[in-house]
């Protein structure tokens, strides 16, 4: 059985950044396992620009951004296996994988970094009534068909869901000559970035209907149209608000689900809100030596933040391997408590003794709040009180905590993060 210091599951933006970071932090024996035929993950089909503004201080396309990390990984002689599917990871960190060349094989790892990314929610999860004709795609599938395979899914398009992929595909389909008739969103707010609404919908005159959903799909062999209806505050269609749209294609951009089947199988504790692992300040799960980063941990808006997070996971995995049995025992653990508008925080716990000099805590809110404050309470004392003109679920928020500040509170058990009205 081959052994590696660090095995990384997934060769997308998170896996690549984690590998590069671990290598730069002194680990020589690293292996990336990727199930696709090339490294880069989802970025390979994201041919639009807007990537890299934070990481490289310039605007890149998805393949260009991935290419920079692939080049770094190859220059650092980081080993990787393509077309390789990981089947199982034991608590002892023995990775079982398979590919055509080697068949079923096992690898022993001192540390494992989970970077499997996420998948799209399908039509089945939505329970939309109607037939099952040809012409219904997830937005990511349509993106791959257009950008990589060179196929046009349809000519008259309706998009359900206003996640970033759906917004970007509204623009992409328009540029390819299709007529995008409407983007419908179940919630009273968009699920995507504000800049994507402006650049992908407003600039192309594509209407966005909030608090609307598809209540019927027409057509047997091929889609012929859909029925759209307004929904009430509980998401139930309002009778009498139905509108008919003729279309041959329905794209679904209705959320992303972190790919955590392997994580659950090995006993990683999961956060029910994010559907990703619970992690501490080192991005380490409840299983010692198993770290998580990127969209498998929680869904990100920008790949730059994925790379930043993955670099932290890679650095901490490297420290774990180098310290081995001499790893210092931690101090007391502080629990982050998201309430009143804050849905979750990553990380969920902080050990000040083990954290870096500064820690970024990322979170999402549960609704749109205008002229509000993002506040953090150390016990009963309000320490952070930051004014925000608007916060929305489609845009990730962050707070920064300094180690020196946390060490001033040796008995602190809970940090409460919440939204307060101005």
Residue ranges and their predicted role:
Residues 362, 395-406:
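Exposed aromatic-hydrophobic patches
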Residues 4-68, 72, 144, 153-199:
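Beta1-alpha1 glycine-rich phosphate/pyrophosphate-binding loop at the start
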Residues 304, 312, 316-386:
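Mid-to-C-terminal Rossmann-like scaffold of FAD/NAD(P)H-dependent oxidoreductases
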Residues 114, 136-146, 249-300:
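FAD-site-proximal beta/loop scaffold in flavoenzymes
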Residues 374, 404-422:
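Short, aromatic- and glycine-rich surface loops/edge beta-strands on solvent-exposed regions
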Residues 1-9, 67-156, 232-240, 251, ...:
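FAD-binding core/adjacent interface of flavoenzyme oxidoreductases
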Residues 68-90, 95-97, 174-261, 357-390:
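A Rossmann-like FAD-binding core segment of flavoenzymes
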Residues 104-105, 111-208, 213-222, 289, ...:
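Predominantly flavin-linked oxidoreductase catalytic cores and closely associated redox partners
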């Amino acid at each position: 059985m081959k052994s590696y210091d660090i095995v990384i599951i997934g060769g997308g933006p998170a896996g690549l950044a984690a590998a590069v970071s671990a290598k730069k932090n002194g680990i020589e024996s690293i292996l990336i396992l990727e199930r696709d035929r090339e490294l880069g993950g989802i970025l390979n089909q994201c041919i639009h620009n807007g990537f890299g503004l934070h990481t490289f201080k310039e605007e890149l396309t998805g393949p260009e951004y991935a290419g920079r990390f692939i080049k770094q990984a190859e220059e650092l002689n980081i080993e990787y296996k393509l077309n390789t599917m990981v089947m199982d990871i034991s608590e002892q960190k023995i990775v079982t994988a398979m590919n055509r060349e080697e068949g079923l094989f096992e690898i022993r790892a001192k540390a494992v970094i989970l970077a499997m990314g996420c998948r799209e929610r399908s039509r089945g999860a939505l329970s939309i009534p109607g037939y099952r004709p040809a012409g219904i795609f997830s937005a990511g599938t349509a993106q791959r068909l257009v950008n990589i395979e060179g196929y046009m899914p349809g000519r008259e398009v309706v998009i359900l869901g206003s996640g970033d992929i759906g917004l970007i595909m509204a623009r992409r389909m328009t540029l390819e000559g299709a007529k995008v008739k409407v983007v419908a969103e179940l919630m009273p707010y968009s699920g995507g970035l504000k800049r994507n609404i402006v650049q992908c919908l407003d600039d192309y005159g594509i209407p966005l209907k909030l608090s609307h959903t598809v209540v019927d799909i027409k057509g047997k062999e091929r889609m012929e149209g859909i029925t759209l209806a307004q929904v009430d505050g509980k998401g139930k269609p309002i009778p009498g608000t139905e509108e008919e749209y003729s279309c041959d294609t329905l794209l679904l951009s209705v959320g992303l689900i972190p790919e955590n089947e392997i994580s659950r199988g090995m006993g990683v504790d999961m956060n029910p809100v994010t559907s990703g692992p619970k992690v501490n300040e080192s991005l380490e799960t409840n299983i010692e030596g198993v770290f998580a980063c990127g969209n498998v941990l929680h869904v990100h808006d920008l790949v730059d933040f994925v790379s930043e997070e993955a670099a932290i996971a890679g650095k901490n995995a490297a420290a774990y391997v180098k310290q081995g049995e001499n790893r210092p025992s931690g101090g007391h653990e502080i629990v982050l408590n998201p309430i009143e508008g804050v849905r979750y925080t990553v990380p969920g716990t902080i050990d000040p003794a083990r954290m870096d000099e500064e820690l970024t805590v990322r979170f999402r809110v549960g609704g749109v709040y205008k002229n509000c404050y993002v506040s953090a309470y150390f016990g009963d004392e309000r320490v952070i009180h930051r004014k925000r003109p608007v916060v929305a679920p489609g845009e990730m928020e962050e707070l920064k905590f300094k180690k020196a500040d946390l060490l001033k509170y040796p008995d602190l058990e809970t940090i409460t993060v919440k939204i307060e009205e101005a």
